[in-house]
From Swiss-Prot:
One of its GO terms (biological process) is peptidoglycan catabolic process. Residues 138-167, 415-439 are annotated as: Disordered. This is N-acetylmuramoyl-L-alanine amidase AmiB. It is an enzyme of class 3 (hydrolase). Cell-wall hydrolase involved in septum cleavage during cell division. It holds the Pfam family Amidase_3. It comes from Salmonella typhimurium (strain LT2 / SGSC1412 / ATCC 700720).
Amino acid sequence: MIYRIKNAVIAALILLCAQAGAASLSDIQVSNGEQQARITLSFIGEPEYAYSQDGKRTVALDIRQTGVIQGLPLQFSGNNLVKTIRAGTPKDAQSLRLLVDLTENGKTEAVKRQNGGNYTVIFTINADVPPPPPPVVAKRVESAPRPTEPARNPFKSSDDRLTGVTSSNTVTRPAARASAGAGDKVVIAIDAGHGGQDPGAIGPGGTREKNVTIAIARKLRTLLNNDPMFKGVLTRDGDYFISVMGRSDVARKQNANFLVSIHADAAPNRDATGASVWVLSNRRANSEMANWLEQHEKQSELLGGAGDVLANSQSDPYLSQAVLDLQFGHSQRVGYDVATNVLSQLDGVGSLHKRRPEHASLGVLRSPDIPSILVETGFISNHGEERLLASDRYQQQIADAIYRGLRKYFAAHPIQSAPQGGPGQTASTNQPGAITAAN
């Protein structure tokens, strides 16, 4: 569940004593993403409300209502825009106040909608546009896809010749780190979204996203491990919480060649249905590249040969920038192509919400050295799709579709293992932008 926006949908328990003739607050839902969040208040009767934002990181929501809202404060992971929702001091005895604490500066808008005698007020909070990356980070220049080629990968250059960065420096790190993974197998890290105290989205029938994602992830791992081409590993194999950054770190420790993050969608519109697949946006790629350039001590951890090059280029920020730019470009191209294959397979299982890969600023897709996709398996907020997502049969069909999409891509683009037996090794794929390290 992601930036569209969601990462947790929480129904707060309401215990309210409505005034005679006043609207009654019946539900609170929170959709929390990295760059946008929505707080939806549902009322029986037409509400009176206001909002203010004295500081850019705290939003005050005032509603004409007496009583107590139980279940507050709501604590979030801190990886997305909303950090906390808590009760504030009301402006008068006839009001309630909610204070929304943000992880970064943002602006708030509100809209009221009516459905018969029921009303919803949707507060949308958008993060301020971040400052441009440091001057050392060059903006990637890309040509827009031609209208006659709607399925063209926007991250691919005009030709498919291999682009490489070579380092002739002495590298003391074990060169096996740059190998293709478990022998000749393609290592797929499978990330089951949410977990532990973070249930993810909760369907109208009570189905929790975290339970759906781990079930599909385990089925996908079984399919991959039954295929000699693959080795499937899980970022979590139980009901516990892992931070967004921690999920990428687990995949890197497993020498993953690719990461698939599995989620279930949710939306205030309960009629929304269908699967979608998301890839890293250019905006997030540029932002992450700036972060990696600043974290010299972590650069050597990168897989695929980039770590070997960066380990010996710390005195040359322009070389570091070039390597990371190539690595991000390569990961985006591979991610988009895999996403296209997975979507074509999901189309045979159920409906698609988006027929092309979508771009988003998602933390789990942030690694430059591990191409990745995020699969929204369907809308758990829709009654029909909730029942499907909770069924073992449909979970297996989703896992099968993801597996077939992965296999179709990697059968056509096999990972090339590093030669064994000496310190000078090469790690690359037959995709443009792969990194080559020659010692």
